[in-house]
Amino acid sequence: MKAAVKIGFPFTPDIEKDMKMFYESLNEKDRRHYAALEAKKLCYGGISYIAELFNCSRPTIHEGLDELKKKDS
């Protein structure tokens, strides 16, 4: 029987640090949109991961996703 392989998220600590610095340089609306885009790229678990990484709420990310959907319409 094979051991289970743990699949983690793709960001190294250095990349996470750069992402946080960039996130903190943005205004509030752009932060929502950036967090939403990063969460969307990660699919399952992405919202929770990005919310923890950027210290923002999951509803904030959902709001960003909604705003981006409205922009596409």
Label the model's feature ranges.
Residues 1-72:
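Double-stranded DNA-binding cores of transcription factors and transposases
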